[in-house]
């Protein structure tokens, strides 16, 4: 179908360009970081998909189809979204999963939050809008269901949980979160700015650690 849109003149021009100017391609180096804006875009779309998935699985109000107007309304709302906590309202220490607990130097009075702790808060609440989705994942995957959440889901739920248990001026230690750079970027664009990332020795080359190194926020233990 697409070949019909290519005119003979355009084909001749392409052949001439191919002969007169050979192209060279260079594979991106392993140290190259993905565009932050692209990651934010993926995070927004992922959040949208998660919200709609949770709605569609709600047994009391099933909905599997959405009009174009409904989709645009949700997407516009995501574009206008501001972070749950303003900059400097919440001190967030993010600790990677491989860091020994005894090596963590948390601020005085800081609240420790684990991923499973936040998810269980909503899974065990039968009146929560995400209860049905989380319950189904738990039934299939057991306690490891957090690894099978839709993209964007974990950050959305972590944000809701922190909004419930924290207030302006608090300090919080996120244990085992974020798990990757996409979650880190989504968290900072939707929930709060991460004050520092605590990483274990030997993780200096990971993209997540490199991302926070660019703003001097890495603590290696």
From Swiss-Prot:
<keyword id="KW-1133">Transmembrane helix</keyword>
<keyword id="KW-0496">Mitochondrion</keyword>
<protein>
    <recommendedName>
        <fullName>Altered inheritance of mitochondria protein 36, mitochondrial</fullName>
    </recommendedName>
</protein>
<feature type="transit peptide" description="Mitochondrion">
    <location>
        <begin position="1"/>
        <end position="23"/>
    </location>
</feature>
<comment type="similarity">
    <text>Belongs to the AIM36 family.</text>
</comment>
<dbReference type="GO" id="GO:0031966">
    <property type="term" value="C:mitochondrial membrane"/>
</dbReference>
<feature type="transmembrane region" description="Helical">
    <location>
        <begin position="36"/>
        <end position="54"/>
    </location>
</feature>
<keyword id="KW-0812">Transmembrane</keyword>
<keyword id="KW-0809">Transit peptide</keyword>
<keyword id="KW-0472">Membrane</keyword>
């Amino acid at each position: 179908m697409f070949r019909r849109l290519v005119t003979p003149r355009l084909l001749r021009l392409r052949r001439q360009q191919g002969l007169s100017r050979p192209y060279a391609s260079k594979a991106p180096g392993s140290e190259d970081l993905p565009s932050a804006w692209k990651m934010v875009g993926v995070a927004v779309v992922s959040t949208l998909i998660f919200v709609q998935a949770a709605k569609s699985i709600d047994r009391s109000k099933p909905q599997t189809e959405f009009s174009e107007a409904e989709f645009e309304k949700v997407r516009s709302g995501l574009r206008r979204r501001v972070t749950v906590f303003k900059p400097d309202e919440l001190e967030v220490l993010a600790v990677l999963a491989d860091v020994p607990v005894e090596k963590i130097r948390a601020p005085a009075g800081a609240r420790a939050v684990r991923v499973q702790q936040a998810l269980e808060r909503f899974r065990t609440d039968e009146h929560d809008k995400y209860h049905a989705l989380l319950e189904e994942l738990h039934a299939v995957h057991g306690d490891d269901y957090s690894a099978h959440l839709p993209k964007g889901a974990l950050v959305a739920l972590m944000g809701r949980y922190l909004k419930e248990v924290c207030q302006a001026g608090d300090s919080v230690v996120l244990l085992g979160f974020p798990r990757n750079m996409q979650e880190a970027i989504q968290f900072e664009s939707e929930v709060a700015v991460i004050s520092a990332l605590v990483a274990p020795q030997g993780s200096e080359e990971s993209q997540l650690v490199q991302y926070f190194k660019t703003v001097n926020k890495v603590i290696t233990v």
